[in-house]
């Protein structure tokens, strides 16, 4: 075992070093090499490391960054898979890079983002102290299948680690059912008030009771199927969260201000990101940090100080034009981005980049469920719409049927002229790419304009 660990770690480090010299990310392939040499190496490398693991459909990267900030503020010796390589190969690579050749950890702590489908495999080997389950939404139907399949993957993974503290979203009727299937200690988090309107017309990925299939009723909805749900037939309902947002003072263009209950006391919390869905990321991170032993004061400071993950409300200077990039990958997340954009009340240029590679989901039918009509409703504030990516023509057609003025839509089949157009914009630029489009465009932006690589 020791010999296999040695060679697994050695080859992983060599592969990572070579790929970085070639200016490649090297975030997952080195882990695949290590797992080929020793399939159980992750379990060996993670011994003695105190881990917070974040999984779920939306919010993994941003929540992980919020948690990281608290670790950094406390001066803890930690690492994280901040590149977004969240399958078992990427996670294994990160542990190997922070281990000695004999497999001894160099860091005592880790913040790990884990793909929801991969959690059933990762958690066979990794035993986190805290697991955060953010939410479950319809996402990449070609890969994940039905929404309950995603939920079952998470449950199956958690069954391998019964001592981990579960921090679950009380407002997600799917995630809230997890304690029925596992014996783990549970901390619930949620939002006790509507967020920027109670839009009951918004599409719901889980409108019916997970137990008896009766349609839920809501005391209020926050977004998607999240909110104060209850089943009028069998009685399944949202349970009161221990960590909760109890009031919203401000949903600004760049930040938010809320009142949050942590440990039975209320705190004024400034969140260093805008949009309703980031309030969920903040309260989920607060629950995880509280369960891990951080004080409320440390949590509040971290939520106001953290920097966003790449492509998640990330700001760019486009040669003097302000730009912001917001990853979109499914109807629920896209709708929240649209809600944020529709509330800006300023002239802007919008960019939508649609790819259909494996990491994006090859089935792009989700764009017809996303509420792009909100863009059309912006009227004269919608100055330009630039469309790009492998499926740019499909996106142009979707925007046409959403009611966007065709005269305002311009298609770019290459990123270099798109970047030139963004930099020449007289208005702030808001970029909405799918995952691989984000990596492609961000890489091209980095080469032209400078900035950090995506793994930094």
Model regions and ranges:
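Adenine nucleotide phosphate-binding catalytic loops in nucleotide-utilizing enzymes
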Residues: 187-331
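Conserved active-site and cofactor/substrate-binding residues in soluble primary-metabolism enzymes
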Residues: 28, 49, 62, 86, ...
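Phosphate-binding loop of NTP-binding sites
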Residues: 3-190, 196-208
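Buried hydrophobic packing segments
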Residues: 67, 71, 91-95, 282-292, ...
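ATP-dependent carboxylate-amine ligase
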Residues: 2-20, 25-27, 213, 226-228, ...
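Conserved beta-strand termini and adjacent loop/short-helix elements that scaffold enzyme active sites
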Residues: 81, 169-170, 189-191, 316, ...
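Residue-level signal for inorganic ion chemistry
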Residues: 113, 134, 167, 281, ...
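Short glycine-/acidic-enriched loop or helix-start segments at secondary-structure transitions
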Residues: 63-64, 121-122, 142-143, 176-179, ...
